[in-house]
Amino acid sequence: MPSPSGPIALIYDDDAYVEPAAGLMGRQVAGGAFLDAYLAHGRWDELVALVKSVDRVESLKRICREHPSSRSRARRLRVVEESRFLEDFGDLPPSRLIHAPGPPEAKHAWARHQIGGHGFALCGLTHTLASVAAIGRLRDLLIAPFQPYDALICTSTAVEATVRAVVDDYASYLKDRFGGDPRLGVHLATIPLGVDTDRHRPATVEERAEQRTRMGIGEEFVVLCVGRLSHHAKAHPYPLYRALDLAAATTGQPIRLVMSGWAASTGTAEAFRRGARLFAPRVVTEFVDGTDPAVRDRVWHAADAFAMLADSVQETFGLAVVEAMARGLPVVATDWDGHRDTVVDGETGLLVPTAMVRGATLDSGARLDLGAVDYDMYLAEVGQAVIVDIAAAASTFAGLIVERGRAASMGASGRRRAVAEFAWPGIITRYEALWAWQEGERSAQGGPIGPGVGGRHGPPERVHAAYPSRWLDDETRVVAAASAIDRLASLLAEPLTHHAAGRRVSDPSTLSGILGLAADPTRAGGLLAALRSRSVGPVRAAATLAWLLKYDLLRLASVTEEGG
């Protein structure tokens, strides 16, 4: 199987890969699982971490250091700060592929455009696709200078359809407005989220008995939900409560619903509890702390079935569904977003039909764009227009309760499917195959090309070209001011005159040498060449020359000084 011909650069931030103490999000669970799997199964010896600042990488260093794979493999972690992106990813990038924990970012495509050439490829994956920011990132794929060798990983076919719908709508607008034939500029690849099938495995007889005893469960049929308690951003609980209550009435069997989750506020948590009492009086509902990893891990052992009746456009995949399959549990899920890719209806679980009323959300996107509603209210408004077939859900639950053998058979089929299709070793192999394809496509491009024209934020010397009295060039004659070398040290020591110093040379001996070369009037181009001979890049060299002129260490040579 092909693999990238060098290290990948991972855009790293704790928010994308580390589970927080509070406010846990599905994307963080998925990000942490990906990182663990890439450490365990990736065929690499060096990893580049692209970070906002070096202090943001300490957790990654710890994760790499403590990971079991580090005991048997010598690996190198290289850290690159984003503030040095143009320099480090210029002539000889430390990596030929940059992977983001979300859709690839336009700023990196624009940076590549400014650098010129095809020095690296960009890759990223989808999570939520409903927010203003997410929609903006998708539109950027159409108008930013992305290349055909860049890639967006869609976690399901429904997600890919959403991406195409957003991009196609925007392309139609651009075509109507400007003409031409705007098209999506990146490659779309469908790769699902993965699951650790060693950690997420069926409970032993002993584990099941112990956990059910711990929870005081007898012969009840236990339906488990794992995830955020969010009626607008995850799953409204009413369809589940109502369906289970109807199933209890139909079968006459005791049912226990276990909600292993966490809520954004005590008000939301209480609303879920109150709803269970009101809408599922025949069902014993228990809430357990889903923020505790140990509790969240053990609670699976007590379950007979897993339920996820998602009805939010915030959802894209539903990782907990795949975890449930890996645990050998039959899944009852809505026929919604990525669920129809993960659950084989009638084989590994059952899909409950959903519907929406055309026209009910026609102005919702515009209301969000205008700020008439915030994102949470937008999700709530749209969610109120999503219908889950409660009668079908009730019939589904009743069937599993009555036919325990069928439920067990579905659970076993789900386990086999999880191992075959969603286990991390295979998913990482698919990632590496995609990255290898990207590298092949990128390296097949033509030779070096110059910096591209235009840009999201053009160079000030072009944007503000009309501001100064004149522009200096290589032929401009300059000369060191009197006592320049004597004044240099104080100017370097004073914050008022030495701020933004990272963009230029600050070494006193180098600067003194340049001033010495200008003891007599000389070409500015000669001083720039002298700086470049000291391995100073062209931008830093020009910025250094500008600083010397700004603080009267160099002056524009007059006719008198030229001897005229």
Q: Would you name each region that the model predicts?
A:
Residues 301-316, 329:
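Acidic donor-binding loop of glycosyltransferase active sites
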Residues 57-145, 555:
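Extended catalytic core of nucleotide-activated donor transferases of GT-like folds
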Residues 330-333, 343, 350-351:
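Short hydrophobic beta-strand element within catalytic cores of glycosyltransferases
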Residues 196-290, 473, 477:
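Conserved catalytic-core segment of nucleotide-activated headgroup transferases in glycan assembly
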Residues 370-517, 521-529, 558-564:
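C-terminal amphipathic helix plus adjacent low-complexity
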Residues 1-93:
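N-terminal pre-catalytic "stem/leader" segment of glycosyltransferase-like enzymes
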Residues 147-207, 217:
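Donor nucleotide-sugar binding/catalytic pocket of nucleotide-sugar-dependent glycosyltransferases
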Residues 290-293, 299-303:
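Short alpha-helical donor nucleotide-sugar binding micro-motif in glycosyltransferases
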